[in-house]
Amino acid sequence: MELSEIKRNIDEYRNNLAQIRGSLDFENKETNIQEYEEMMTEPDFWDDQNKAQDVIDKNNALKSVVNGYHELEEEVEDMTATWELLQEELDGDVKSDLEQNVLDFKEKVDQFELQLLLDGPHDANNAILELHPGAGGTESQDWASMLLRMYQRYGEQQGFKVETVDYLPGDEAGVKSVTLLIKGHNAYGYLKAEKGVHRLVRISPFDSSGRRHTSFASCDVIPEFNNDEIEIEINPDDITVDTFRASGAGGQHINKTESAIRITHHPTGIVVNNQNERSQIKNREAAMKMLKAKLYQLKLEEQEREMAEIRGEQKEIGWGSQIRSYVFHPYSMVKDHRTNEETGKVDAVMDGEIGPFIESYLRYTMNQSDN
């Protein structure tokens, strides 16, 4: 790479950062950081722990954006200074390092822009992820368990904490249903890309004739809310609370007492289970939190449907609306039908490497909103 080309790239990066800064409302973010940090020094700050944690999370999110931008800005200035030194005295090793830094910088800007896409009202929240197999018995239940492992691996790779809140094993293999609570900054913002029907095509290990089978599993993702984030009133007469023994993956008993909780909301038919804690009280609190989140999500979806009717739009619902196909046979391919993102590295995807699919979906939704 010639020095003139290096300079063009650096100037382009500087212009990109200037455009990003213009869209960030930078001064307002820095003012908010100052206000949050003043709140954190108040003597009664920890009196309400949920509210305090919410302030800390919001402050950390803002600082991540502001500090991330400053780091990129400083790196551009460092590259400019190195380029100016090379103008005075050409050093092959220094030039080679600068070339690599210029090439690597594009990926850093792309990742920063991706972070900025997660600006939805609940993107920063933890995520509640549910998997349900489609028709097909053992085949689809096994597929649901493969997706479970994929999301567990993805969560670990992202540094998220993944908890199994509810688990109902399949009769022979796999799972009939499973609920994960995925904790971490922007967990919902990323994982909302996974909501929909996932399709598997493979030679079935359960078919002695070695025939090819197609299986489906649905993934539902909603944000976890703090109690003060949403206003959802639940009439005690509208719910039934049942207790049962908790059991985990593989059938092992987590607790021999009836600490697990099932809450049924009769007006909507929504059922939530929680068996993650040893305490029945804590499981009930967590289950009520999940129920409120589901009712809030239902309310949002009803509003979206009303708007779609006004606009004359129709959305497909059901097993025909697959978002992604995972083909193991007769060839290896994972393809997202919304963005056309695809890869032949099926094993890597099943090991949790779904980042490219999530990133392409986030950019796709940004482009859709711009249009």
Swiss-Prot record:
Signal peptide: none
Protein name (Swiss-Prot/TrEMBL): Peptide chain release factor 2
The organism of origin for this protein: Staphylococcus haemolyticus (strain JCSC1435)
Keywords: Cytoplasm, Methylation, Protein biosynthesis
PANTHER family registered for this protein in UniProt: CLASS I PEPTIDE CHAIN RELEASE FACTOR, PEPTIDE CHAIN RELEASE FACTOR 2
Miscellaneous note of the record: The gene for this protein contains a UGA in-frame termination codon after Leu-24; a naturally occurring frameshift enables complete translation of RF-2. This provides a mechanism for the protein to regulate its own production.
Residue ranges the record marks as coiled coil: none
CC per GO annotation: cytoplasm
PROSITE patterns assigned to the protein according to its UniProt record, in alphabetical order: RF_PROK_I
UniProt keyword Ribonucleoprotein present: no
GO biological process, alphabetically ordered: viral translational frameshifting
Post-translational modification: Methylated by PrmC. Methylation increases the termination efficiency of RF2.
Gene3D superfamilies: 3.30.160.20, 3.30.70.1660, Release factor (1.20.58.410)
Keyword match Methyltransferase: no
InterPro entries: PCRF, Pep_chain_release_fac_I, Pep_chain_release_fac_I_sf, PrfB
Family: Belongs to the prokaryotic/mitochondrial release factor family.
N5-methylglutamine sites (modified residues): 252
GO MF, one example: translation release factor activity, codon specific
Function: Peptide chain release factor 2 directs the termination of translation in response to the peptide chain termination codons UGA and UAA.
UniProt subcellular location: Cytoplasm
